[in-house]
Amino acid sequence: LDFSEPGILGVYVDEQQVALREATLSQAGLKLGRELASSFSSLRPNDLIWNYVVNNYLKGQSPPAFDLLYWNADSTNLPGPMFVQYLRRLYLDNALAKNELESLDVRLDLKKINLPSYVLAAREDHIVPWKSAYASAHCIKTASRKPAGLRFVLAASGHIAGVINPAHKNKRSFWTAA
């Protein structure tokens, strides 16, 4: 919701990059899911690219069967016009957090969303930095802090593993806001 601090992903989202995407995708076309996946992998090249180059290509080893690898490879194509609007309005303009985004001529005001909210972030997330998720949690109004209001949980691990791995003693953990 709040893209004021995009983290390392910001290397791909600046005025020049967005203008290039607008020139090629704003009227039609697709942003290919495999291109997005490659972009996300390039943000953590040692873990998500070079590890496989060395082990698979150079050493001839087959990658182990690993559910996270399958999930990571399951990408989705995005409509070009939606993708460039997302980059421009949400990332560059941060319009949603500023209550400046409109849909069907209606201004979206996050403070009018008065529902219990559970916000999960992952400490090593390279796509959604946990500090951005924390800032996003405070863009919405909550009826009360407890018992139903806002619950922010910071999980150990990264973008995918931080979501699906359960907490485990001496291996994975999580923290909650008091």
Placement of each model-derived feature along the sequence:
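Short beta-strand/loop motif that positions the catalytic acidic residue
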Residues: I113, V119-A121, D125
